[in-house]
């Protein structure tokens, strides 16, 4: 067996993350013993440690890479030696590659993960006008992926309209055109009704946040509907959309493809997407 791989995930509330299992199983399948540690600043021996201390520890201990999640995706940028152009434009990093010399490079595979998920799950979706509900969390990455995968007009709706507009400004600046506008999520149903598709980028649909982010009665069979939530895989939104005959994109595709792209960056190996999906769905 070749050299082992040591990876980690820095964030808060990591117990349910499926990312470690995907990386460990894929590494082993490719003949590389892989250890992937959860580094939870709320619920582990890393509790209370600042981000720089944890990043330095990973360098000293010979980690090959780190995934970064809430609440550190923005805070990690100034601590890195290099950041990809895309991650710099978004102001968020979720993947840090550490080379043999300890040089750190930040990437954002949330963007590529959602984009690849769209290519795979909604290859023929109409993209003239799309609504994204939710500007927090992975909202920036989802919006960037939508616009760079063909969406002509994207309306990002949030209860905090200033946050929605701030996201729009970031994406418009990154892509060099006025593709995104921030709008109020209150009464968004009329806007959704006139759109080609809608993506839920809020936590609504998770066990801790049951329900939907908008009234699904505005949907018709002509809409396509996406969701970033993957626990459960069939959210209330997707269940309602499928009952209408809508094309749908569940949250597993983004979750799997962001890990696929991160594994490639960490190891230089070509991951087996089907195998990583099988691991994800078995958990």
UniProtKB/Swiss-Prot annotation:
Residues annotated as binding shikimate are 17, 69, 73, 94, 110, 258
Summarize where NAD(+) binds, as residue positions.
Answer: 137-138, 158, 163, 203-206, 213, 228, 251
Pathway it acts in?
Answer: Metabolic intermediate biosynthesis; chorismate biosynthesis; chorismate from D-erythrose 4-phosphate and phosphoenolpyruvate: step 4/7; Aromatic compound metabolism; 3,4-dihydroxybenzoate biosynthesis; 3-dehydroquinate from D-quinate (NAD(+) route)
Q: Which CDD domains match?
A: NAD_bind_Shikimate_DH
Q: What happens when the gene is disrupted?
A: Cells lacking this gene are unable to grow with quinate and shikimate as substrate but do not affect growth with glucose.
Q: Which GO terms describe its biological process?
A: amino acid biosynthetic process; aromatic amino acid family biosynthetic process; chorismate biosynthetic process; shikimate metabolic process
Q: Where is the active site?
A: 73
**Gene Ontology cellular-component terms listed:** cytosol
Keywords, ordered alphabetically: Amino-acid biosynthesis, Aromatic amino acid biosynthesis, NAD, Oxidoreductase
Do you know what upregulates this one? By shikimate, quinate and QsuR.
Q: Which reaction does it catalyse?
A: L-quinate + NAD(+) = 3-dehydroquinate + NADH + H(+); shikimate + NAD(+) = 3-dehydroshikimate + NADH + H(+)
InterPro entries recorded for this chain?
Aminoacid_DH-like_N_sf (IPR046346), NAD(P)-bd_dom_sf (IPR036291), SDH_C (IPR041121), Shikimate_DH-bd_N (IPR013708), Shikimate_DH_fam (IPR022893)
An MF annotation (GO) of this entry: quinate 3-dehydrogenase (NAD+) activity
Q: Which HAMAP family match?
A: Shikimate_DH_AroE
Give the record's subunit note.
Answer: Homodimer.
**Task of the protein:** Involved in the biosynthesis of the chorismate, which leads to the biosynthesis of aromatic amino acids, and plays a key role in the quinate degradation pathway. Catalyzes the NAD(+)-dependent oxidation of both quinate and shikimate to 3-dehydroquinate and 3-dehydroshikimate, respectively.
What is this protein called in UniProt?
Quinate/shikimate dehydrogenase (NAD(+))
Tell me what organism the protein belongs to: Corynebacterium glutamicum (strain R)
Taxonomy-wise, where does this protein's organism fall, top ranks first? Bacteria, Bacillati, Actinomycetota, Actinomycetes, Mycobacteriales
């Amino acid at each position: 067996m070749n050299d082992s791989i040591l990876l980690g995930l820095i964030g808060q509330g990591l117990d349910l993350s499926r990312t470690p299992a995907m990386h460990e199983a894929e590494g082993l399948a490719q003949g590389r013993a892989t250890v992937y540690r959860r580094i939870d600043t709320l619920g582990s021996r890393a509790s209370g440690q600042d981000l720089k201390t944890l990043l330095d520890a990973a360098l000293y201990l010979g980690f090959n890479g780190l995934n970064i999640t809430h609440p550190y995706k923005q805070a990690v940028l100034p601590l890195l030696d290099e950041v990809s152009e895309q991650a710099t434009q978004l102001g968020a990093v979720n993947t840090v590659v550490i080379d043999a010399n300890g040089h750190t490079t930040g990437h954002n595979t949330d963007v590529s993960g959602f984009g690849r998920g769209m290519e795979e799950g909604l290859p023929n979706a109409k993209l003239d006008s799309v609504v994204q509900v939710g500007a927090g969390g992975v909202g920036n990455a989802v919006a960037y992926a939508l616009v760079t995968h063909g969406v002509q007009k994207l309306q990002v709706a949030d209860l905090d309209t200033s946050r929605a507009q701030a996201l729009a400004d970031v994406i418009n600046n990154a892509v060099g055109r006025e593709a995104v506008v921030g709008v109020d999520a209150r009464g968004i149903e009329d806007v959704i009704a006139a759109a080609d598709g809608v993506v839920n980028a809020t936590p609504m649909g998770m066990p801790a946040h049951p329900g939907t982010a908008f009234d699904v009665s505005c949907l018709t069979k002509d809409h396509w509907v996406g969701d970033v939530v993957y626990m459960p895989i069939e959210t209330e939104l997707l269940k309602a959309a499928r009952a209408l005959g809508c094309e749908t994109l569940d949250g597993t595709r983004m979750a799997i493809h962001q890990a696929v792209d991160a594994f490639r960056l960490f190891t230089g190996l070509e991951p087996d997407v089907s195998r990583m999906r099988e691991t994800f769905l078995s958990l």
